Amino acid sequence: MRAVSFLLLLTPTAAMFEDQADNIDWHRQNLGRAAHALFHSENTQRLAIIATESSVLAALDLRSGSVSWRQVLPVGESVTSLQTNGKVLLSLSTTPAGAFVRLWSMRGAMLWDALLPPSAGAKEMLPPDALFAGPGVVVSWGDSVTAFDYNVGDVAWRWLASGEEVQMRRLLLVGEAEEQQLQAFGVLSSGKLLRATLSPKDGSLVTSKALGSHSASDFLPRSQMVVTLDQASVAWLKGTALLQHKVGSDVIATTQLETLLPSLGGLGAAQLLPLTLPGMLALAVPAHGDAPAATVLLSVTGGGVVVADTLQGEVQLAHALSREGKATLARIDGGTELRVMAFEPDGKASAWSEAESLPYSAAEHGALAAAWLNSYARKDGSLGHRLLLSSQDDALQLMQAAKDGGHVAWVREEGLSSVQGSVTLVPLPSLVTDADAEGPPAFAFALPGVLQGLQRRWSEATAITATDEPAPRYADAYGTRQVLLLHGGAKVFGLHTSSGELLWAHWVAPLRHGAPSPEVKEVVRMEGHKVWAIVQDEAQLRILCLDAHNGQLVSESASTGELLHVSKLRLDDGASGLLLFDASLSVSLHPDTPAMRQAVHARLDSFFFYLLFKAEAAPSLRGYSLRLAADAGKHFELAPRWALALPSDVELSSTDFPATAMVGSPVRVLGDRSVMHKYVNRNLLALGLATPQNSSDEAYVQVMLVDTVSGVVVHSARHAGCSAPLTLALAEHWLVYHYWCGNQFQYQMTATELYANNTLLDDPISLLVGGPLDYTDRANMFDAFSPAAAQPHVASQTYAFGTGVAAMAATLTAGGLTPKAVILATTAGQLVTMSKNLLDTRRPLVHPSKMSQQQKEEGLVPYAPTLGGINPLTVLTHRHTIARPAHVFTAPTTLESTSLVVGIGLDLFLTRTAPAREFDRLNDDFNHVALVGAVAFLTVATLASNWYTKRRDLVAAWK
């Protein structure tokens, strides 16, 4: 038995060295826009615990802004509340399936969770409420109040409201410690307020009473119920009336806002702010007509409602509660000034403090969206204030207020959690030596630059780069140092591809003050290091020219319309332009110059476009061409050519082959020296249709290859009994797609290869030596209208695969000569590289020992019905995980062997991969010293032997 155990331990294990990880890659954790936040201090640890709109729960180190821990909740789950008692963290979240109650340790470990089902027959469910009560956690939701055991999460008791329909809203714990009672407030369908008094020990009903007499339209109040810190009042809004219940009485007082605030407009859209203050409420009134927005503080301590203060303009309020029970209210005016109001335990409020400056820039981040206050005691006994700010661009930053201007502790660009569209890469500037403009350059002049370059290369090859040292801001010889351009929302980001460092971020402000944030639709590279950012701002279409190296705005233009599609044009002189289509199918040029119009007119018969309409009631794929406009006020217009109707009850997905990707060879050389001509059609669009997994209709997956110029369906495959999710990857002449097969309860991958029906006996040697074809030359372009274009030879093969795939892409290299690999982003958050040889449609059905010599020379792999497990050495992300992966992009470097891989989801990940090893570059651990020493030794030995030979011949001649 011991021998068997010993032999089992001798099985080979795949691994990598620790110094190999994070050497050529980086991982950026994102959280999303902050929705809730609280602060926690324990010993020397200072944390900000936040919940985001992206269903993420995380703790940030207040010193650096780094993520201490993070929990990614399921998609579609909305966190509605965060609470802590100093020892544990309580989170409440809602989904269509119910409300989740979770208890976490302050280090991010989930202690227990529970699911509360929705009320039967309820059309709309309001957010739950919870509090810590003795040895348990009490939660009110729907028509019930449930208590959970603090230690294990078991249900201790549950109280259900009887009678008419009710929605429980708030919980209060009133009374002394030994005689505490639980009061649960809800709204009945008749519009009355239900107050149920329960025992926190067993949930027994003490009293229950319906208060007030209001219309049934108040059954679901638009305003949340707000409880004052002293728990003396419960308030909510009904229309323009403020309803206030005095705890301990049966009275509901009504105050009309028009009478209380006659000078303000927009009272019908006013909202109570969720601030817990002693004897005070905060009311946010939006701008209306000429009346500006205002925030009103209402005092409710004297039995009535009195306006304590009216704050005009853009004001953000935040509150904090000290351990001694003192409340602090912070007021942020315009994002640049901070004033503080302190409350005594008896509820007495002080005046606003002297203004302190905040270094907030609205030009870089937009308006403030939310603020959270963290007050702390300074060494001199005074109070200091930190502010956690969430802005319009989703950025999260910690600021320290001070009279001398304050400072920004850190900034997290959380807009990177919602990156949209494709990525754009722009090389960094090269290091150059300014030469004398007069006279030809000389070697003596270039020698210092050459020596500096050699010294820099030597230091990069031998030195170990410090982790806190920024990556160089200049290009390298391998093309791995570039600017990675991403866009999300109204912001464009420039990241360093070597380190993930944020080089710059450009916020696009709305044209109209107070308008919704614009949306960056596309980023298109121009000539040089300039890029166009196409932005949709309400009914305006804006085109921004940005410097990709620093994010500076070079120029901006605007036009009317809603963007539908944009295409890049390249003129004969090397300049670039844009063709823009709006929702009315109108065509515009940028820049609209005579040279641009003349260039488009000269190639008018070669412009073809396709548009995929997914959001319409009847989805369709339509093809268009460009023609001269009949309207004298326009130059060009779209002409419909073909249309393909699509079903409306399926999930649509599509992908194409990048127009700039290189194809190394137009043929595939077989083992018998014959060739198969690749069907290289850059007009192909891979269109996938898949029924949802929970659909009651007949399940199927259908994949079509459509020529977007002629509208011909070149290939179509239908898989019955299969369903979504469907993921596609299209390369030069092959397609790979991944889907779920419900009949066999497994994931499957299908590979399809297309070859032209060509019988010419081309010489393989001449085809390979001739190099890659220039497909931008019209002589080498694909003719979509030829008879052979619609009749390729198709070979397909399907394999079983052991995991779900969220996205995939094929590697791209500088010349397209390197064997391809498929990059898979698994649903578990890993990036996996898979050789295309494993997905070859011509894998022979023989044992490896019986393969012919020709099959071995061709590099074929014996057939197997499954692709097997994932080799750990093929996992590019190694110890990292990409939360919710959505896209995979690849890009070439100047090295033919190497391709850049970018994984995008909630997180960002970038690495380099070499499918055929780095055959054109020395390894990083190459012994450069030994090489230089060997060359120097051989040089000295050669000179010495030459001298010795001449000396010997001279001595021999004298004899």
Predicted regions and their residues:
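Repeated scaffold domains used in trafficking and secretory/extracellular systems
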Residues: 31-40, 75-86, 118-133, 163-176, ...
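Short beta-strand elements that form the blades of beta-propeller/WD-repeat-like
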Residues: 45-51, 87-94, 135-141, 146, ...
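Solenoidal tandem-repeat scaffolds enriched in leucines and small polar residues
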Residues: 128-301, 320, 326-331, 341
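C-terminal scaffolding/assembly regions of large eukaryotic complex subunits
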Residues: 19-40, 45, 62, 399, ...
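Cleavable N-terminal signal peptides of Sec/SRP-targeted secreted and luminal proteins
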Residues: 2-15
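A short beta-strand motif characteristic of beta-propeller blades
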Residues: 22-29, 66-72, 110-118, 154-160, ...
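Short loop/turn segments that connect beta-strands within beta-propeller blades
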Residues: 62-64, 105-107, 150-152, 199-202, ...
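WD40 beta-propeller blade core
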Residues: 58, 102, 146, 194-196, ...
